[in-house]
Amino acid sequence: MNASVLEASYPISFQKKEAEKLGEYLRQRQCVNLIGMKRVGISNFLRFFLNHPDTIPTYINQKEKHLFIPVDLNDLVEQEIYPFWTLTLKRIVDVADQSDLSPEVKAKVNDLFVKSIQFQDLFMVIDSIRHALVLIGENGMYPTIFFLRFDRLKDKFNPSFFDNLQGLRDAANGNLAYVFTSYRSLVSIFPEARANLSVFSQTMYAKPAHESDMRIVYDAYRKRYKLTLQPPIEKALFAVIGGYMQYLQLGLIHLNEVESSTLNTEKDILETLLSDERIVLQSEELWESLHVEEQKILMQVVKSQQVDALEQERGRYLWDTGFLVGEKTLSIFSPLFEAYILHLEHDESKKKKTAHLTRKEHLLFTLLKEQLGEIVERESIVEIVWPESQEFGVSDWAIDRLVARVRLKLREQDTPYEIQTIRTRGYKLTPLKE
């Protein structure tokens, strides 16, 4: 158990249905593709699953020893194949060092990492991973690698990539399992690997959480950050967020910043959250993650228009991931997201009339201008623009979208600056060349 991880303190009943299903797959050593809408709470659930001391005996096996190895692709400085495998090997070493493996085995695993880094050869890195996983298996542990945000590699796929993943499983005699998290299925992200993926990946969808699970998360935040919300406000908050974890986190931040005593109804909560730029940006990220046909279906639902059988088939993702709920009468999972969709057209027309910078856009521009001509890294942007969200994390999409908005408005305002993207590092504001 990692005591510093908040989710490790959740009751073992947290998201029980999902934990039972994932645990059964891992008991059978099957690989899983865990799919959910962006920021729905997969990371929150997995932090619980990976760190709670009772996860393995409760949901997998009381007698077996399992080694969970999380590899978060957000930690990749470069979204390339070689850094990916190097990060994977490093995380295996990190987890092995903290495990019950003998000092001799730990030393061997560490030695594999050191040698592979010295030669900087892709084949040697993958071979070192193979040796490390075999060592772990031979010493009575079942390794499971959790590749978090695996879709970040979608542009770097090559035919041998999944062959190498399968090769590692074969070398471990089937004792190695993978869990891939993504917002779309691996088959749709890597269509060239369809044949490989069908062999070893089971599909599991993560939908917005039930209110009882949201209550667990809320209570943990409330105790850690000493939040005080009146029961009617709590009830209204749960009603408008619809089980969406990022809305809960951003909503609590917003309500902690404003005078919540003036808020009495669900309508009050909805209106104040809709005024928060962070929540609007999160809703936009959700909307932009959808295909045009899926967006059209959601627009039909909020306008109470019929969705026919063909549209339902094409928009299956909306039902699988929980964007849409209900059978006879369809509805959007969250009144907050529904309100965003209804305001889309109005917001678009409003954007065309003004090029004024919003608060976060102004923070970003000021930061870049203060370091004119210098690279400002993503971490610095998060620290200045999203200080309240550092613990929860800020997605690449949110940063890129904010930069794109400022870039567009600078052109509309005819300012003498432009924003340059520095690949894998950050952004730089430079004077326009005449």
Mark where each language-model region is.
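P-loop NTPase nucleotide-binding core
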Residues: 24, 28-154, 158-159, 242
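Winged-helix-like regulatory helical subdomains adjacent to P-loop NTPase cores
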Residues: 234, 239-321, 356
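N-terminal pre-P-loop "Q-motif" helix
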Residues: 10-22
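The catalytic "switch" region of P-loop NTPases
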Residues: 3-5, 141-144, 154-240, 254-258, ...
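DNA-binding patch around the recognition helix
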Residues: 325-326, 352-357, 399-434
